[in-house]
Amino acid sequence: MLEERRLEVLRAIVEDFVLSNEPVGSKALAERHNLGVSPATVRNDMSALEEEGYITQPHTSAGRIPTDKGYRLFVDRLSGVKPLSRAERRAIQSFLEGAVDLDDVVRRSVRLLAQLTRQVAVVQYPSLSSSSVRHIEVVTLGPRRMLMVMITDTGRVEQRIIDSLTPVDEEIAGELRATLNCALAGQRLVDAPEVVATLPDQARPELRPCLATMTGAVLESLVDRPEERLAMAGTANLTRASVDFADSLRSILEALEEQVVLMKLIGSARETGTVTVRIGRETDVDALRSTAVVATGYGRGPFALGGMGVVGPMRMDYPWTMAAVRAVAKYVGELLGAD
């Protein structure tokens, strides 16, 4: 267990390096921070921290910089989440409240997160597995053609144009609408296939062909559309921090283009209010071993509808980044949870 003073020295090294991007020396630490000890004592503490693998010396004439292990200890033991000011919280809330639909909520959220943190921001659309049916609308488009619109409780909209084998009119469309809403409104989407499978057999004979076609469309809308969608913003922010990456910036950008990689990093945040931080090799992605990922879930209650977070260099302001991610997630969850 490190002594408290050495923890303070590590905290000071991380904060100074994040701010300056320059190796930190013992004399500068003693002058800038109220550590209560001499530069010689600070130097001894730094030597101990280096032996433990928390800091390293990039070259012989330089000071020290944090390692992956040092950043990990800083996040776990030393950094608190900075509280946002009332003005900052109000600005976030006002910007998000201007959204007109789910796509706009996601677009605004990912842009805002990228601007606040100056990192690459990623927001996952509400997962189908976490959503429920709010309403189904059926509209006639012609004698044998209908439009089916399914709206989830998170604002996700799925549309299908359906060609019927039998003629349809407004009366039939209304009956289909009523039947589907009676059976599915409030149902979780993951439970919907089992529910709709039995509907045609329960309908009056004249309605069964249309209802069978309609329930097939409902199933297709759940199966054919990708389960998970992501939005990303702020990739240009990586270029401003290119000196922080041991690997080429190109390999990092290529990794971020892979949805499966992003889902692994962001979509795994399944709890609201809990911010997770993966540093360096903890990302389990070779191309991202020079980066850090800060993520959390958003939604109503303790379980997340989706995840959001940022990807940036390990040399980031963790307390501020964690606060920004948590704040945006909180307001997005409240917005999507509003009736």
Swiss-Prot record:
Entry keyword set: Repressor, Stress response, Transcription, Transcription regulation
Transmembrane annotation, as ranges: none
SUPFAM superfamilies reported for this sequence: GAF domain-like, Winged helix' DNA-binding domain
Residues in coiled coil: none
Paired cysteines (S-S): none
Keyword Repressor on entry: yes
Family annotation (Pfam families): HrcA, HTH_DeoR
Keyword 4Fe-4S: no
GO-annotated molecular function: DNA binding; DNA-binding transcription factor activity
InterPro entries recorded: DeoR_HTH, GAF-like_dom_sf, HrcA, HrcA_C, WH-like_DNA-bd_sf, WH_DNA-bd_sf, WHTH_transcript_rep_HrcA_IDD
Superkingdom of this protein's organism: Bacteria
Gene Ontology biological process: negative regulation of DNA-templated transcription
Role played: Negative regulator of class I heat shock genes (grpE-dnaK-dnaJ and groELS operons). Prevents heat-shock induction of these operons.
Family as reported in the entry's similarity comment: Belongs to the HrcA family.
Name of the protein this chain belongs to: Heat-inducible transcription repressor HrcA
